[in-house]
Amino acid sequence: MSIFNYFLKKEKKSSASLAKERLQIIVAHERSKRQQPDYLPLMQKEIMDVIRKYVNIDEEQVIVQLDNNEDCSVLELNITLPE
């Protein structure tokens, strides 16, 4: 029976380490969300409203990305404009 228990314990450790890895990924993802400023969604909406005054675009055609470096933050907007 001790050999059988040995293999069962390994599966539990493997499962635990897998769960730990998944939790670390979730925590890292949540931390990255917190790093974006609170005003970013409102700013994105206002920029979209201004662009819509001149060009008809969908929300899916806009990609907003915020990159934080040590010295500065860069807000990047990629908008696919119709022809």
From Swiss-Prot:
The keyword Oxidoreductase does not apply. Keywords: Cell cycle, Cell division. The keyword RNA-binding does not apply. Gene3D superfamilies: Cell division topological specificity factor MinE. GO terms for biological process: cell division; regulation of division septum assembly. Pfam families: MinE (PF03776). SUPFAM superfamilies: Cell division protein MinE topological specificity domain. It comes from the Bacteria. Prevents the cell division inhibition by proteins MinC and MinD at internal division sites while permitting inhibition at polar sites. This ensures cell division at the proper site by restricting the formation of a division septum at the midpoint of the long axis of the cell. Belongs to the MinE family. This is Cell division topological specificity factor.
